[in-house]
């Protein structure tokens, strides 16, 4: 994909359904009693991988024709059917990690596999606690494919060594299928879509600080839901607006979950003017409309709990860092090295290719501000967030930018480039 420089960004956008919520809704709909209907389900390949795995587990679902990307799922109750072939999770770490919690509670053996990228990603973070609950799991040195012998799980008390919403959700799902109570303590508060979705489907949970408890054996009911627009996808357009002082952007039906909305705080501190209108609660998730105007772009430091809250948005924030006045420093982000690519290295490599000075660290980056970037040939590294992040950086670069392997954006946002093109002014 070739991205040409722009002179402004303006318009209105409604985003595909939030990826994190779409995964969780589909998985819970599969083990609920009765039907569920999800409108604005994510259009990305990752969430399609979840649906494909559920079909292999005997779940009946249908994509309705027409606008809205509606998925209707007929729940199977807490018991699924043994798959006749390995569950293909594609590129989706969310699918393999969260669905493993449900598969571990079934009375059959499953194999969960993925593509080359997924097969390099660490899975010990779900293997260890699921084994402690009673599941039999083998892996390739802690990486996929996973062979999971499900069975009679027992609730556990588990302190997570790494803050991960995917792992937390996996264990909550397993806890729902276990005997007794499961207590999970996370080192830092992570996004709570798993807890919110479980409550929407009728489960009872208790949360106190960084601890959440769930009692096993609860039945779920189906729901009808409009999935809010994906805030991580909105980050790219928000950062595009931040690059141009006269930009004006409206984003409708946008997820405003407090555990995800730290991005908005950071961007406002950096100088982007954001106002929220028509805020409402839908199945426990806050949803609103944003009005956005550009301004002078200051710098930021992202560390500690902010890093955990912004782990998916850091690539695009880092990509625009050279254009800020003071630059951006990212710390405590070692987790970025085990995403779809080594995102710390990918960001540093591409920024240097565009002529920027970057200090790469083991757990982050320091990117000075006040720099100009030049258009050049960049690599996506097969990573959807890297491809989209540098498409935004390219809007202010001098000359055209070619992003190789940009088709990987289909993993989370197939319509990204057409949506972006509809907002830029040249």
Which stretches of residues belong to each language-model region?
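Structural preference for solvent-exposed beta-strand-turn elements
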Residues: 1-426
């Amino acid at each position: 994909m070739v991205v040409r420089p722009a002179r402004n960004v303006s318009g209105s956008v409604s985003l595909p359904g939030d990826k994190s919520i779409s995964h969780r809704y589909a998985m819970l709909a599969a083990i609920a009693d009765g039907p569920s209907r999800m409108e604005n389900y994510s259009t990305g390949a990752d969430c399609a991988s979840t649906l494909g795995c559920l079909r292999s587990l005997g779940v009946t679902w249908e994509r309705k024709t027409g606008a809205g990307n509606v998925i209707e799922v007929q729940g199977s109750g807490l018991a699924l059917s043994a798959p006749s072939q390995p569950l293909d999770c594609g590129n989706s770490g969310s699918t393999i990690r969260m669905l493993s919690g449900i598969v571990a509670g079934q009375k059959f053996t499953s194999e969960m596999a993925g593509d080359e990228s997924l097969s390099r990603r660490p899975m010990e973070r779900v293997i260890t606690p699921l084994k402690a609950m009673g599941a039999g799991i083998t892996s390739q040195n802690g990486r996929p494919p996973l062979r999971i012998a499900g069975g009679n799980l027992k609730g556990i008390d588990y302190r997570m060594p790494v803050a991960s919403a995917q792992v937390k959700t996996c264990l909550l799902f397993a806890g729902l299928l276990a005997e007794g109570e499961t207590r999970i303590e996370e080192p830092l508060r992570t996004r709570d879509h798993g807890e919110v979705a479980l409550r929407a489907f009728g489960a009872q949970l208790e949360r106190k600080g960084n601890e959440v408890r769930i009692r096993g054996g609860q039945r779920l009911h189906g729901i009808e839901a409009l999935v809010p627009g994906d805030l991580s996808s909105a980050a790219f357009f928000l950062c595009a607006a931040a690059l141009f002082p006269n930009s004006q952007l409206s984003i409708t039906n946008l997820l405003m979950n407090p555990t995800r909305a730290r991005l908005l705080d950071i961007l406002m501190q950096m100088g982007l003017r954001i106002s929220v209108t028509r805020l409402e609660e839908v199945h426990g998730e806050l949803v609103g409309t944003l009005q956005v105007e550009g301004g002078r772009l200051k710098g930021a430091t992202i560390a500690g709990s902010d890093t955990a809250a912004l782990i998916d948005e850091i690539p695009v924030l880092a990509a625009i860092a050279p254009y800020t006045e003071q630059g951006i420093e990212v710390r405590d982000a070692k987790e970025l090295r085990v995403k779809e690519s080594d995102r710390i290295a990918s960001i540093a490599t591409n920024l240097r290719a565009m002529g920027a000075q970057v200090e790469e660290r083991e757990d982050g980056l320091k990117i000075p501000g006040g720099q100009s970037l030049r258009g050049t040939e960049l690599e996506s590294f097969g990573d959807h967030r890297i491809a989209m992040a540098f498409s935004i950086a390219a809007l202010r670069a001098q000359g055209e930018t070619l992003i190789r392997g940009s088709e990987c954006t289909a993993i989370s946002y197939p319509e990204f480039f057409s949506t972006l093109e509809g907002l830029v002014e040249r």
